[in-house]
Amino acid sequence: MHNSTLDQFGKTISLLLVSFLVLTSCSHKELPVSDLIRLNQIGFYPSEEKTAIVASDKGAYKKFEIRDLQTSKIVYRGLLSVSRSSSFSPKKTTVLSFSALDTPGEYQIEILGIGKSQPFVVKEHLLQDVTLASLKGFYYQRMSTPIEETYAGKWHRPFAHPDDQVMIHPSAVSPKRPAGTIISSSKGWYDAGDYNKYIVNSGFTVGVLLSLLEDYPEYVLQMNTNIPESGNTTPDLLDEVAWNIDWMLTMQDPADGGVYHKLTTPNFEGFIKPEDCQQQRYVITKSVTASLDFAASMAQAARIFTTVEEDYPGYSDKMLAASRRAFEWASKNPLALYRQEELNKKYEPAIQTGAYGDRSAEDEFFWAASELYVTTGEDKYLEIAEQIAPEQFTPPVWSRVAGMGCLTFIRYGGSFDERGKELANRMKSLLLDYTESAVRNLEMSPYAAPYGREAKDFFWGCNSDAASNQGIAFLYAWLLTGDKKYQTAALSNMDYILGRNATGYCYITGFGYKSPMHPHHRLSASDDIVEPIPGLLIGGPNPGKQDKCEYPSDIPDECYVDDQASYASNEMAINWQGLFTYFSAALDASLEK
C-alpha cells in the first residue's frame, strides 16, 4: 500500500472515530427519559441487590450502561437478560441487574434505542424517610383535634369531628343505653378515605404497629415524626397509637364489656372538608370480631405501655382490664358476627358504610387468646389458643388475623414453658413452610419479585395485603433462619411497591417521580392543596374494578387508575398503612450497616 493511500486510510479512520464519539456523546444527551425503565424510585442500598425492569421485550437491545450523574462518566456496563412473561399478561419484560454498583451516589440507566431512566440514588438508610412519612400518615388521620401547621405544614386543618354527641343506634341498644342515648367517643383515626371509625380495622392496625415496636425497638425509639407529643419520654409510635386507643376504649359498653362494631354516619360523607360534615354519627351494634380485635390489641398494648408509665400512668392496667372484659363478652357471644344487610332490615337509619364483616371469629379468638396469654401468662388462654391454632400460616390482614397470633407466639416463644414453646415451634414451622413456598415465585417473575407473578396477587388492597404482609413474613423467616434469600425477597417486594411494577407508579403519595396525585381520600381531596397528604400507601391494581371507574387496562397488574373516584384501586386505609409502616421500618432496620 502506498504512503498516500495509508494517509488517506488513516484520515478516514480518524473521521469515523470522531464521528462515533460525537454520535455517542449526542446520543447520551439526546436520549429521552423512558417510562419503560421501571425501578424502585426511592433508590437502592449499596450492598444489596439492584434490579431494574424494561417493560418490553428486549428485542435488539442487548446492553445497558449506568452513568454517574456527578462525574458524567459511565461506571457500569451490563447485558439485558432474557425476556420474561406471565400467565396473565401478553406483555414481556426484561431484567437489568447491577448489584455490583455499590458506591453511594446518583445515577441513571441508559439503553440506546430505548432511552434513559429517571435519576436514582444508591445510599444507606434508604427507606428511612418513607418509613417516617408512613408513620406520620397516622397523625394526618387524627380527628377531634386541629392538625397544626407546626406539625403538618401546608396540610394543616382546623378542629373537626369532636364526636362528643354520638348516638346509640337502635341496633346497639342495651338496658342502660336505650336508642338515642348520647355518648362521647372522641379521638381516634379516620379509617381510610372516609370519615368513620371501625374497631375491627383499628384493632388490627394497632396490633401491627405495636408488633413493629416489639420486633424492632431500637429502630422505633429513634423515629421522630414531629407530632405534638414528640419530645416526651414515649416513642412517637406509641404516642400515635395512644391517640387511637383512647377512642377505642370509649367503644366498650361499660355495662357488659362488649365492643361496638363501628362509629359511623349512615352514609359516606361527600368529598367535603371534615369540619363541614353535618350527618349524625352513631355507634352500631356490638360484635364478636370487634370485641376480640379490641381484646387482642388492648392486651398487647397493656404489656408495652408499662414501659411508659411516666407519660401514661395507669394506662396498662386500664387496657388489660378492658381486654379481659371484651374477651369474656366474646366468649359468651361467639356467633355475634356483624351482618349489615340483616341489621338494615330491622333498624333505621340504614347503615351503608364499610361493613368489616366476617364469616367466622375463630381467627380473632386465636389472636386475642395469644395476646392475653403472653401478657398474663395464664394457662386458660394458652388452652384456648392450642385448641384453635391454625394449620397453615397466612400473612395477616384485617379479616384473617390468625397470623397475628402466630407471630406473637414466634416472638415470645423463647420465654414460654414447654407447652407454650411447643405451640410456638409449630407456628414457626407453619411460617417457614409458607415462606419457602412463596420465595420460589421470585424465579422468572416478570418484575423480579415474589409478589406479582400470578393474577391472584392483584385485588383490593394488594399493595398491603399481598405485597407488604408477605414481605413481613419473609423478614420473619430471615430472622429465624439467617437465610439471605428471604431478606432479598422482602426487598424485592418493596422494590415492586415503590416503582418496579407494571404501572410504573410508586404507590406512596409524595415519593418518587410518579406517584398518586388523586387518591380516594377525602382529607386530601377537600384541602384545596394540589398535592395529596404525603406518605400514604395506595391500594393498588384491582381487576375487580368495583368502583366502575374507567381503567386503562384489563390486565390484572395494570388495573390501576389515579382517579379520586377509584376507591377500588386508589384509596388509602389505616390497616394498609400499618402493614406498610411495619414492612418499611423492619426492612430498613434489618439492612442497617
Task: Name these PLM-found stretches.
Residues 13-21:
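Sec-dependent N-terminal signal peptides
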Residues 252-261, 334-342, 377, 440-444:
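Proline-centered turn/helix-capping motifs that create local helix->coil transitions or kinks
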Residues 229, 233:
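Acidic, glycine-anchored loop motifs typical of Ca2+
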Residues 2-14:
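Bacterial N-terminal signal peptides that target proteins for export
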Residues 236-258:
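Carboxylate/His-rich catalytic cores and anion/metal-binding grooves
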Residues 37-114, 124, 136, 140-207, ...:
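Aromatic (Trp/Tyr) and acidic
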Residues 21-33:
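Bacterial Sec-dependent signal peptides at the C-terminal "C-region" and cleavage site
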Residues 389-395:
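Solenoid-like repeat scaffolds
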